[in-house]
Amino acid sequence: MPARSGGRQAAFPAILDPVRRMAHGCASSAWTIGFYALHNWMLALFDELAQEGAFATHPFLAPAPLAPTGRGVPTGGGVRLTGRWSWATG
């Protein structure tokens, strides 16, 4: 999460280190924590306006369907999403 939003703004290897260590004890927990970390890291790559909207409330839940089965079309005040998502993790 960006520092201006209360996060550590860590580099990606630093984000993955605790996940890797956790996996030695419980792979399921590491999988879950890894996805939560990945989702926030991906949002930190968006422009500042999108980040402000996402990180303004706590806790912020960020599911991330990584299979691109939908389509986003710009509209007057945002983006209209259409498609079918059979699963998402997070």
Pin down the residues of each PLM region.
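Glycine-rich flavin
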Residues: M1-G90
